[in-house]
From Swiss-Prot:
PANTHER family: RECOMBINATION PROTEIN RECR. A zinc finger (C4-type) spans 57-72. GO terms for biological process: DNA recombination; DNA repair. GO terms for molecular function: DNA binding; zinc ion binding. Residues 80-175 form the Toprim domain. It comes from Brevibacillus brevis (strain 47 / JCM 6285 / NBRC 100599). Belongs to the RecR family. The gene is recR. This is Recombination protein RecR.
Amino acid sequence: MFYPEPVSKLIDGFMKLPGIGPKTAGRLAFFVLNMKEDDVLDLAKALVNAKRQLHYCSVCNNITDLDPCHICRDKRRDGSIICVVQEPRDVVAMEKTREFEGYYHVLHGAISPMDGIGPEDIRIPDLLKRLGDEQVKEVILATNPNIEGEATAMYISRLIKPFGIRVTRIAHGLPVGGDLEYADEVTLTKALEGRRDL
């Protein structure tokens, strides 16, 4: 179907988002076109500001507008525990439980040979450097409970063993094949409480 060029470009822009196909992109485009101009400008500003102002924390690799991030700045947290997660949104999911009081390390991915992602492509070297510099006694591996997450957890646990640091894996109160960001607080709390040594 023919759309004017600005509409086609808007649809193409929405299709670049994960999980958005042509039909959904079209619905979103027409929704935006029907919004008040001030609301559209606010949305556009929010997108541009997020892109310009956010970066990765130099300590944990979480997304932040400060460096270090607010979690790494918080001296009330337990510096002896680091929870390793795959993505920044997983930090948010863990924080919602209000159960974890240590620090985080965000990998920005998982080992996935089928997708051409090896250990050198995610933030594992940064984690090992932190373990050498800080007084860490336990690393909780909270990668997703799928093949890539499990492979990443096993790989990291082998690298950490020589440090003499306790390595635990969150319990599988989470569905296999699921993502942390979609788990509710109770499920994540149970998963944290039931973590096990690797």
